A protein has these predicted regions:
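N-terminal glycine-rich anion-binding loops that anchor highly charged ligand groups
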Residues: 7-44
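Peripheral docking tails and interdomain loops at the edges
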Residues: 314-359
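Conformationally flexible catalytic loops at phosphate/diphosphate-handling active centers
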Residues: 166-250
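Redox- and metal-dependent alpha/beta enzyme cores, enriched for Fe-S-associated oxidoreductases
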Residues: 248-283, 287, 293-299
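Structural signature of the thiamine diphosphate
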Residues: 140-196, 349-359
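Glycine-/acidic-rich phosphate or pyrophosphate-binding loops and their flanking alpha/beta elements
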Residues: 8-14, 235-258, 271
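Thiamine diphosphate
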Residues: 37-131, 141-163
Length: 359
């Protein structure tokens, strides 16, 4: 098998290649536009013949997430992918995984809604992803790629963080990033962990190995005092993640008087917006949250101290802007610009919005 390779491919395809290369043990998914290339690519590559990775098309998204729950519970690196309405069907299983502290990777290549909506791109799953879309007090790790390269890179990173903290992780992409083609440097092959390594690294896992003590993985606890302590332990873990795993990127901020906050494909559009605005003498910079949870609230608050205004650009009706406003706590004016229904905003539109709202 080849080591590191440079390819031209879609974001969805890059993610599939990266999954095989980073030692993923199993994929369970169901086709839905605009992420179907993930399962198609995995099926074409036949990793079960090389790395022994399992690839299974489940009968539904509900089945997929419960297969993920079971696979993650054995200490295996397992993943699923879907798009917005499909991920909605997974919310019960994600809540169960969070409650039982089972790691796993969920990929959401967003499309417009609500309901079945459209097959065009959107970023309207932000609340569902960052607030815990199922029942109970929980969070999951959420990474937002803005390039084909990051679609590949975030697979291994998501698995590393998921197992480090025993938490489900999500790559929150969108139809633009999933379908666009770019050069990508695929990572070298990482060997799959042996059962012996899993037993050593994951003492909580239910492996079924001979001579091992039984392990019960569950989110159920009928005694309220014990359940409260379990919840308090989860909150302690979430605080640790907030302290250590915030990721973000800034550009053109040295002399910025205004700042655009955007993630995913909206951040790519914002970069061109900034180029156009600066050509007109408007000093504007970019703040791109890479982790949507944990959210870089302290970093945004610090950046806001020297600003005259913040424009939050999203492909939705206004979701991340709530987190930005909480972060700056009224110290600077925050306004939103977004498009709905699967329409992707143009850079010229963002420049116009920036002028209308602040200048």
């Amino acid at each position: 098998m080849a080591e590191q390779e440079v390819k031209l491919m879609k974001g969805n395809e890059a993610l599939a290649h990266a999954a095989i290369r980073c030692g993923c043990d199993g994929y369970f998914g169901y086709p839905i536009t605009p992420q179907t290339e993930v399962i198609e690519t995995l099926s074409e590559l036949k990793p079960w013949e090389t790395t022994v990775m399992v690839v299974l098309q489940a009968e539904s998204e509900v089945a997929s997430i419960n297969m993920l729950y079971g696979g993650g519970g054995t200490g295996k690196r397992v993943m699923t992918s879907s798009s917005s309405p499909g991920v909605s069907l997974m919310q019960e299983g994600i809540s169960y995984m969070a409650g039982a502290e089972v790691p796993g990777l969920i990929v959401d290549v967003q499309r417009g809604g609500p309901g079945l909506g459209t097959i065009q791109p959107s970023q309207s799953d932000y609340f569902q992803a960052t607030r815990g879309g199922g029942n109970g007090d929980y969070y999951i790790l959420v990474l937002a790629p803005n390039s084909v390269q990051e679609m590949a890179d975030f697979v291994d990173l998501s698995f590393e963080l998921a197992f480090k903290y025993r938490i489900p992780a999500m790559i929150l992409s969108d139809g633009v990033i999933g379908q666009m083609m770019e050069k990508v440097v695929l990572p070298p092959f990482k060997p799959r962990r042996t059962n012996e390594e899993i037993i050593k690294e994951c003492p909580w896992a239910s492996t079924g190995c001979k001579g091992r003590k039984p392990v019960v993985i569950t989110s159920l606890e009928l005694k309220p005092e014990i359940m409260e302590q379990r919840n308090l332990q989860l909150q302690k873990k979430y605080r640790k993640i907030r302290e250590n795993e915030v990721r973000y990127e800034t550009k053109f901020m040295d002399d910025a008087e205004y700042m655009i906050v955007a993630f995913g494909s909206a951040a790519r559009i914002a970069e061109k917006t900034i180029e156009l605005a600066r050509a007109e003498g408007i000093k504007v910079g970019l703040f791109r949250p890479i982790t949507l949870w944990p959210f870089p609230e302290k970093e945004i608050a610090e950046a806001a101290k020297k600003l005259k205004g913040i424009l939050v650009a999203e492909i939705n009706a206004g979701m991340m802007i709530e987190d930005v406003r909480l972060a700056v706590n009224g110290t600077v004016r925050c306004e939103h610009y977004g498009r709905l229904g699967g329409i992707v905003p143009e850079p010229e539109e963002m420049v116009k919005a920036l002028k209308e709202k602040f200048l």
